[in-house]
């Protein structure tokens, strides 16, 4: 007797025009990858346009469940010090802050979708160098931490395991959850 089980799922991918943020000429961050990757995936038939979605809104409460009010206010009011701005690696602007909020919104939606449908991804997700009180390494808000905290706070799961395959440690994520046994990084 042969038993075949097929699990069919539809991959959802968070994507927004905000993700490819304009940077100064010769900036070292490869922002264009956020336009090139989805275009290539559709071109080669890996996904269809129906797999792509534009993230919705994220509440301040979702952000403040992870980030300090002082830091988030400084981001929104564009009042980081020059040193704090340099640490992020990006020139601070209103559109950049909108981009970071949109990335986190996409990761929250992907996490919820993955819980019920198996798999989802955010083209620009993985902002794991952002700490609760500061940005670092091209990361202003920690989307992984925001999504994890959202899933736990809404009772959608009790624990989260973050498997970070980046060559650099997700130091911001590790710091945010260092005393929280509900999230393992």
Regions found by a protein language model. Name each.
Residues 5-185:
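HDAC/HDAC-like amidohydrolase catalytic core signature
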């Amino acid at each position: 007797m042969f038993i075949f089980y097929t699990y069919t799922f539809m991959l959802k991918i968070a994507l927004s025009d905000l993700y490819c943020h304009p940077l100064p000429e010769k900036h070292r961050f490869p922002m264009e990858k956020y336009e090139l990757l989805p275009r290539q995936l559709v071109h080669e038939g890996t996904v269809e346009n129906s797999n792509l979605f534009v993230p919705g809104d994220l509440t301040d409460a979702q952000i403040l469940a992870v980030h300090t009010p002082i830091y988030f206010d400084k981001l929104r009011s564009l009042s980081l010090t020059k040193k704090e701005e340099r640490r992020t690696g990006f020139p601070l602007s209103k559109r950049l802050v909108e981009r970071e909020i949109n990335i986190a919104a996409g990761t929250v939606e992907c996490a919820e979708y993955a819980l019920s449908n198996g798999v989802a991804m955010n083209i620009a997700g993985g902002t794991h160098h952002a700490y609760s009180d500061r940005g670092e390494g091209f990361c202003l808000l920690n989307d992984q931490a925001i999504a994890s905290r959202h899933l736990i706070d809404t009772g959608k799961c009790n624990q989260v395991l973050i498997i970070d395959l980046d060559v650099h440690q997700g130091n911001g994520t590790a710091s945010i959850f260092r005393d929280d046994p509900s999230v393992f990084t």
